[in-house]
Curated annotation (Swiss-Prot):
It is found in: Mitochondrion. Keywords: ATP-binding, Ligase, Mitochondrion, Nucleotide-binding, Protein biosynthesis. GO terms for molecular function: ATP binding; glutaminyl-tRNA synthase (glutamine-hydrolyzing) activity. It comes from the Eukaryota. It is an enzyme of class 6 (ligase). Subunit of the heterotrimeric GatCAB amidotransferase (AdT) complex, composed of A, B and C subunits. Its EC number is 6.3.5.-. Belongs to the GatC family. It comes from Drosophila willistoni. This is Glutamyl-tRNA(Gln) amidotransferase subunit C, mitochondrial. The keyword Protein biosynthesis applies.
């Protein structure tokens, strides 16, 4: 119990040292992740060379902007959207009939877990000091990249 309490206090100390302008240094944490640090190479290298242009009408773009809170007015955003659609169309063609379903990509790896027990952290105020805006001991996040004036309409 004392060992787990010391670990939680260690994380609280790291959180207390960080301020609004800096992020946590995850290399200081004691449990390294098994998730790859670098992205995997593109499974479809010829995807960018595909000139299969499916027209996307303005109503679809407006719907996607509203649902995803992402501004798609720039050419780069439309290019990324078209590339994502082409990638999704290619994934559909991959034969997966004889492939067993996975719950996670790390299914066969041993993960480092700790006992799920309640410990005394008592560092709520230290952690909440890192938030720019708080409300009733909760973090307040921005509503996305849509200005607040548009939300009232």
């Amino acid at each position: 119990m004392l060992r787990i309490s010391n670990k939680i206090r260690f994380y609280c100390k790291i959180a207390a040292k960080s301020d609004l302008k800096s992020k946590l240094d995850f290399t200081q944490l004691r449990h390294p992740t098994k998730v790859p640090q670098q992205p995997e190479p593109n499974a479809f290298p010829d995807l960018d060379n595909n000139t299969d242009d499916d027209p996307i009408d303005s109503k679809t773009i407006q719907l996607l902007e509203r649902l995803s809170l992402v501004d798609l007015d720039s050419e780069e955003a439309l290019k990324t959207l078209k590339s994502s659609i082409q990638f999704a169309n290619r994934i559909v063609d991959i034969p997966t009939e004889n492939v067993p379903a996975l719950y996670t990509v790390l299914e066969k790896q041993q993960l480092q877990l700790r006992n799920d027990s309640v410990t005394e952290g008592n560092c709520r105020q230290e952690i909440l000091r890192n938030a720019k805006i708080t409300d009733e001991d909760y973090f307040v996040s921005p509503p996305g990249n849509i200005p607040l004036e548009q939300q009232n309409e």
